[in-house]
């Protein structure tokens, strides 16, 4: 299942929330969303997940279980504020090295400042680049992580192929993303929370509900667990699996470069 489609006008289109936009239009629109929320991104995730994103991220790092080796290299994509990368570094006993890549400079600035305050900047690099065109050689990383970022990429299938390219043989892909709720009744509650409460909380916190409306809509347009797992396989990954969190509100996808 590809995220990119041919429009009635003959051009390539993709989703920006519930809107259909040209593939080249999506990234600037997404950038604008995250420029607006960069300084309050963690609060945004608390609102989006009712605080559960912290538990899900801890579970993601536990699944990765980074070893305490200085030659262990992780690429964390769409990780601007450093939330995942910091957890990886700490879990490894401050031995592993994480490269934080994001297309949004505002997010990276927040992450770099947080790293300095934590005293772990020596374990981190911050790189402004596009997930669809990674500025790294093939077979460079032991792991590739992305949390709540893949749905914002205009061409998801291209980003997954790039992930495969830069991973070493035996390297692991981990994708944490909001997903399709599979628990009866929870889906109704989550829809009500998403479309009624989240934009209102967003406006209260930041003065602007538009970024939160987009983020809610982008979750609904993202492929379900099985369709996304198929996309990961199509990119070349083996031993593909997923684990639902909180009834499917989020899911952790895993794949290996064999």
Swiss-Prot record:
InterPro entries referenced in this protein's UniProt entry, alphabetically: SAM-dependent_MTases_sf, UbiE/COQ5_MeTrFase, UbiE/COQ5_MeTrFase_CS
Database matches in Gene3D superfamilies: Vaccinia Virus protein VP39 (3.40.50.150)
Keyword Metal-binding tagged: no
PROSITE patterns: SAM_MT_UBIE, UBIE_1, UBIE_2
Keyword Transferase belongs to the record: yes
Role played: Methyltransferase required for the conversion of demethylmenaquinol (DMKH2) to menaquinol (MKH2) and the conversion of 2-polyprenyl-6-methoxy-1,4-benzoquinol (DDMQH2) to 2-polyprenyl-3-methyl-6-methoxy-1,4-benzoquinol (DMQH2).
Family: Belongs to the class I-like SAM-binding methyltransferase superfamily. MenG/UbiE family.
Designated name of the protein: Ubiquinone/menaquinone biosynthesis C-methyltransferase UbiE
Organism placement in taxonomy: Bacteria, Pseudomonadati, Pseudomonadota, Alphaproteobacteria, Hyphomicrobiales
Gene assigned in the entry: ubiE
């Amino acid at each position: 299942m590809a995220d990119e489609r041919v429009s009635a006008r003959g051009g390539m289109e993709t989703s920006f929330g519930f809107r259909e936009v040209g593939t080249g239009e999506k990234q600037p629109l997404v950038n604008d969303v995250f420029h607006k929320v960069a300084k309050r991104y963690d609060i945004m995730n608390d609102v989006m997940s009712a605080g559960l994103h912290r538990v899900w991220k801890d579970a993601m790092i536990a699944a990765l279980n980074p070893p305490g080796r200085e030659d262990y290299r992780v690429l964390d994509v769409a990780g601007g504020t450093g939330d995942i990368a910091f957890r990886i570094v700490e879990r490894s006993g401050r031995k592993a090295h994480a490269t934080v890549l994001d297309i949004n400079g505002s997010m990276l600035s927040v992450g770099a400042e947080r790293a300095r305050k934590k005293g772990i900047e020596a374990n981190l690099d911050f790189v402004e680049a596009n997930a669809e065109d990674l500025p790294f050689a093939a077979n460079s990383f032991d792991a590739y992580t992305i949390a709540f970022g893949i749905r914002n990429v205009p061409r998801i299938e291209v980003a997954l192929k790039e992930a495969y390219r830069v991973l070493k043989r035996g390297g692991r892909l981990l994708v944490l993303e909001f997903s399709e709720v599979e628990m009866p009744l929870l889906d109704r509650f989550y829809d009500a929370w998403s479309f009624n409460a989240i934009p209102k909380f967003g406006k209260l916190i930041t003065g602007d509900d538009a970024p939160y409306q987009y983020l809610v809509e982008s979750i609904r347009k993202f492929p379900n667990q099985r369709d996304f797992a198929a996309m990961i396989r199509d990119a070349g990954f083996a031993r593909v699996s997923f684990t639902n969190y909180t009834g499917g509100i989020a899911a952790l996808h895993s794949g290996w470069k064999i």
